[in-house]
């Protein structure tokens, strides 16, 4: 079994919510038989949210360079970021990003109306309002020129699970279809995020229903990521998720270099 295992959603202590070093993540990846990883550190130009001003680009790029030297034959290391609500500050992002050679950029929705967190929003809104609003926002993210892939497309369920429960795919089918069509039309992709397999939700983000719909609509670009914030989660459920994609009909997953999508046969 020589599957080329890739983990394209990982956080180190270059993100506000992880304590792991780039070095320890790389070691863990090699131990687990992962061949290529991409760090996707939280990044935001929005004041008032936790990731604002946290990423030190000099530290980050120095650590990536150092680890590329150390592990050059054993592991391919890519440098990326995960941008919160990239549709809200396009001009600022443009000025920063046109000078930084990232390999890969994820776009995600963690807040509404600039800085209202998903959980906070949900505490004062119904299940239907919360999920509808979430998919509306994701629909705005997917056309941003500053992202390559939309992260955890149905993330809302992670926050909603305890209080509102998971959503029924059929209730949001039209909206999700619109989102996926926009992603495809704008040349972007989606990811399979395995982090919710490690919690109570017990399915990937997005669900298999969304993955199938993406395939049926002609979607091709898809990455797989653990969303690890701890070394023990690096590479978690990647192999299984690739099998799921294969069974749906996907022929490739994707890796990135200099923000160009590169297919990897599965």
Report residues per predicted region.
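Charged catalytic cores and adjacent phosphate/nucleic-acid-binding surfaces used
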Residues: 1-12, 22, 163-266
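An N-terminally biased module of ancient metal coordination in phosphate/nucleic-acid-related enzymes
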Residues: 2-87, 96-99, 159, 164-170, ...
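Structural preference for beta-strand elements that scaffold enzyme active sites
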Residues: 4-7, 36-38, 76-80, 103-106, ...
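Alpha-helical scaffolding within the catalytic cores
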Residues: 25, 91-93, 207-208
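Conserved residues at the C-terminal ends of beta-strands
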Residues: 40, 108, 153, 193, ...
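Flexible, active-site-proximal loop/turn residues at the rims of small-molecule/cofactor binding pockets
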Residues: 43, 111, 156, 196, ...
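Extended substrate/RNA-proximal surfaces in nucleic-acid metabolism proteins
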Residues: 51-185
